[in-house]
A protein has these predicted regions:
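Boundary/linker segments flanking structured domains
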Residues: 1-198
Length: 198
């Protein structure tokens, strides 16, 4: 087996997938929402996917049962910088009562509008009412009772910011096994998110 040729073949396959993702990025747009729209959790009894007003943004995710790639964008680079500064201020509270684990700062240069890029394996979440991707987005929005589960946790530090976020989700035709994480890194290299290890 020629490892170099195999690596080149895999790289070409990943490049083709990434090119297709960005060729029609609007097809992957799930919703645009204002941070102030995030519903109160009412002691974990309410979640974005069941809130009568907010769920319209996310309903489609409960039909996504295969591997997914997702990212959150701000409207502008300036908004992304403001959001990242607020996240850094929240990070400074680590160790305090009520702190929830958030992603690390991305050390890459050239950051633009993207806050975070992630992937979620297909299948159904532990909660039978959620797909894996819906469960993961709930965690990022801040609606998970375990504070040690890493996520963006927007409800806990960003609800008062005057800005919109857009969620993009790529729902793949098949489950991609280990190549999913290679695609995540390639997309993150393209989008240069403000946080997450890429």
């Amino acid at each position: 087996m020629n490892i170099i040729q195999e690596q080149q073949r895999i790289n070409q396959q990943v490049n083709n997938i990434v090119t297709r993702i960005f060729k029609d990025v609007e097809a992957h747009k799930i919703c645009r929402f204002h941070l102030s729209e995030l519903p109160e959790s009412n002691n974990w009894q309410n979640h974005p996917n069941i809130d009568p007003v907010f769920k319209k943004h996310l309903d489609v995710l409960n039909h996504y049962k295969r591997d997914c790639l997702y990212w959150f964008n701000c409207d502008t680079k300036e908004d992304a910088e403001i959001l990242n500064q607020a996240l850094n201020a929240y990070r400074s509270k680590k160790g305090q009562n009520g702190y929830r684990v958030v992603p690390t700062t991305n050390k890459l240069d050239g950051k633009e509008k993207t806050i975070y890029v992630g992937v979620r394996r297909g299948n159904t979440a532990k909660n039978p009412k959620l797909t894996n991707i819906m469960g993961r987005i709930n965690q990022h929005l801040g609606y998970y009772h375990q504070p040690k589960t890493q996520g963006l946790q927007f409800l806990h530090w960003a609800k008062d910011l005057e800005m919109y976020l857009t969620l993009y989700v790529v729902h793949f035709d098949d489950n991609l096994d280990s190549i999913l994480y290679v695609i995540e890194k390639a997309v993150a290299k393209h989008l240069v998110p403000h946080c997450g290890r890429h």
